[in-house]
């Protein structure tokens, strides 16, 4: 949607590769591209949608120094889709302190109904173990209780839909 809306400049940061467990919730994840760079897959898709898009692709896992460097560019909006707690907490804290507009994705694993998605303040999330952990650590480590816009689903996780991996 963002690329289709005419955004002129975008940076995507992701050091991860497609894994079979991503297929129930991540657009780039297909049965045919396991092991491929998520950032490169999304870059190809974004450029196919909007060939005029000025796109910076960083194929690395995010770290505090990288976040601080990217925030210096003062982006108009930040979308966080990090799925690991520690880097997510650090990213949210730095973005929050910068005063920039940010929206953060919460857990989608074991949730199947996209019509249940909501955008709310993080303090209003429930039935989301991932959001619960994010809230807990933001509060404990940084005193942040609210003021973070998030996308989450109040749908109860469906345990039967989980795929166990090693």
Predicted regions and their residues:
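Adenine nucleotide-associated cytosolic modules
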Residues: 1-166
